[in-house]
Amino acid sequence: MAQLTRDALRNMNRPLAAAEVLVLGASYREDVGDTRYSGSELIVRRLSEMGAELRVHDPYVPHWWEFEKQDEYPSPKHSLKRFFRGQEKLAKLRIEQDLKKALCEVDAVIFAVRHQPYLDLDPDEVVETTGGPIAVIDCFGILNDAKIKRYFELGCEVKGLGRGHVKRIKDEVREEREQMYLQMNKKAHVRVRGS
């Protein structure tokens, strides 16, 4: 996921280093509040190692002890911190409970856990809240094709694990835009000639 995030940002001519990245979901599975053995922990640790600035939102998790107490949790010398460089700043990572606040001015959003509130997110509202086009990463098929298409229409870059058809959707959106511009230019040319 960290590499997909890097690639999506790169496609938008933005570096991952110092990018504000929001991870949606900290728990190990949907609609529960347990972070033990969460795949999101590995995503956060790898992104931190790559230089990203991180935010996390999870409606079911008030504290992420694997980070807040990373030197002693689950026990001394057994934290996943030991496998990654530059993990010290993650001890200050806190889970944001307010989704709108978490989305504000981020460069990338990673849909990491299939929580019900994330399934209901509207792409237009997400992009408006973030302040413009973002990189959108789908870890578990959370986004349907209509939402993926809408993110592309809004100028976002979308990547997904096991979502090979995303490129086809992107190409369709690009083709629709090109057709629209051709029609607009044709109408403008006709108006100019008719004057």
Task: Pin down the residues of each PLM region.
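Structural/interface elements that position substrates and couple domains in central-metabolism enzymes
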Residues: 1-195
